[in-house]
Amino acid sequence: MGSIQIIFAAYCVVLCVLQMLVLSSEQFTITGLERPVLAPLGGILELSCQLSPPQNAQQMEIRWFRNRYTEPVYLYRNGKDLHGETISKYVERTELLKHDIGKGKVTLRVFKVTVDDDGSYHCVFKDGIFYEEHITEVKVTATSSDIKIIMHPPNIKGVMLECHSRGWFPQPHMEWRDSNGQVIPATSKSQSQDENKLFNMTMNLFADVGLHQIVTCYIQNLLTHQEESISIVLTGDLFSWKIDWILILSIIACVMIPYSMTSYLQQHLIHGSCSQRSHHWRKNAMVCMSSVIAIIGSMLILHLKQRVPISDQHFELDTLYLEDISVILCVVIVFNLKLNLLTYYRLERKYDGCTPGCKACFYILKIIIIILPFVFTFGCYNAIFLKYHQLQKKVSIPDPLYYFYTSWLVNMEMLGVFLVFFPTFINLIEFSQFIKTVPKPIWLCQENMREDDAIRHR
């Protein structure tokens, strides 16, 4: 009988304990925001949690923490704020609003929100051995109006556009659009984070030559849906350099033909016919034309061959290299033409058989032959180099290889300067030697020829 009473008493104790646990588990729950809270960078974040049913929480422990329970963001216990147990970076940036603590409601306020404040926040109410918690998700957002488009100098293939924006969080969405709002695939995209963990975005677009359109760079924060944009108008004026190059090459081609024909005219004045030495003119013309065609063919091969993909970081450097090579080859064309003709005239200085009536015309032609190359060479070189330096002043390439390329380019410019002054120097020597060979002024020669003709008629 005694053992039965003991068992019954133990059963009652267990039943009471279970009943107390059931009752205690129904003491309260915690409610709060179920959706993520957006916190602007540098602003104020407020997170609230509420006991349900409402009850006084002044003698409870209220703990806010992030990832670890033992590292609280804020700790309140028995009516006191325990700042000594909180994380150091939150000590001076947080406060607990306890205006409604009698109803079981508290609010954590965080000042000067940073990117590191992004994440989950746990709100814990503890009463004795019983506790409940609620988790609130915080999303830190940062937008920026600092957006700009950098247009690199137009080149033979098109124009490279760069859209830059900094100070975003989280990583924003970025795209190019045309005037109709249609998305244009970007050539490349890149992002980086600064010391404050904010995203700096860069997006490139390579636009074809000659397109007249409005291109817009859009960037959007996917959390706040805030959007920034900037537009640029691509017109034909951006590619005026192309017309300049066509004009330069056309001038070279147009002047080259009459320049070469001066040999034909010279022989005609000397001998009255070009049949005796026409093969010299043909050889000279063939040498000039073949060399020019070879140089122009090399330029076309370099430009038409896909050397570096557009998405490659060295694409712009390669394009600039092609432009500089084109400048150098244009200089070589002019120099080659000039050198061939100077050599030919140097070897063809025998004017035996020249009739007296053509001496004045011959001297005039000789002056033209000497002066024309000088003017032509000087004009072509100046046009080429002026346009070249106009392009170079606009170039800004952050590529580390650009410095090595610049040193190589300086050497090429020195070579170009040599090619400019060498024919000019030869021209001056030719002109001085020609002046020495002229015994009298040309008009005196013409008077003497008239006197000779008058004597013969008598």
Curated annotation (Swiss-Prot):
One of its GO terms (cellular component) is membrane. It is a multi-pass membrane protein. This is Selection and upkeep of intraepithelial T-cells protein 3. Disulfide bonds join 49-123, 163-217. Encoded by one of the 11 copies of Skint genes clustered in the D1 region of the chromosome 4. Residues 259-283, 346-359, 436-458 are cytoplasmic. The gene is Skint3. PANTHER family: BUTYROPHILIN, SELECTION AND UPKEEP OF INTRAEPITHELIAL T-CELLS PROTEIN 2-RELATED. Belongs to the SKINT family.
